[in-house]
Amino acid sequence: MKIFISIILLAIGVYFIQPIWSEFLSVPGTFRGDGSERIVVFTADDCGVNCRDAINYLNRSGHAFEELVLDNNEQNLKLFQQLGGSDVVPYLSSGYQLVSGFYPQDYLSVLAAARGLAILDPAMKKVYTQHFDANKNSLLVMYGTSWCVDCAALREYCSVRKIQILDWDIELDADAAARYEMLGGRSYPLVFYGARRMTSFSPEALRRLMKI
């Protein structure tokens, strides 16, 4: 059973929903008043090229977002920490998605989740459609290997809880390997639930990814 605690921070206009499940307490997420995902990116004056590239990328996307600078701003720093931030900027939150650092393909996943697959070019749209069923419902998919420890942990977690997952071994499946490269995979497992992306496994991260 889900209990929702809503926190409205009027000073910056961000709507946070913090879910409490019986098994764990999640970090908050960033949402609009209507429940849609809201993109917030934290930066710092000394961040340099990574923060500039992140902001430029989001500006070019045309999608609304908020930049919150951490320098000399206790409120922004507190939010940053509440959302799981530590020592890496830029740090992006969109709904329950979190991205540490700037990786274009991670940001593209955030935008696709927020705006739909129509924003993708034909090649990337073809990749992302593999993460949905024929009725356009999100599928849980994993790009992994047979030897990856976290991949095995995710398989076991899903098996015990009867969570359906498409398990692609990129060392055996050439098509999956090609998609993994196009998606900018950097480690294993690379997990998607529809357009939403997860780059490492933990039970909390999976629940946040699937909003369950």
Task: Give the label of every model feature segment.
Residues K2-I20:
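Hydrophobic membrane-insertion alpha-helices, especially the h-region
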Residues P28-A64, V127-I163:
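Local sequence-structure signature of Cys/Sec-based thiol-disulfide redox active-site neighborhoods
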Residues R52-R60, K78, Q105, S109, ...:
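Solvent-exposed, polar/charged alpha-helical surfaces in well-ordered, non-transmembrane soluble domains
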Residues L68-D87, W168-S187, M210-I212:
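Thioredoxin-like thiol-disulfide oxidoreductase module
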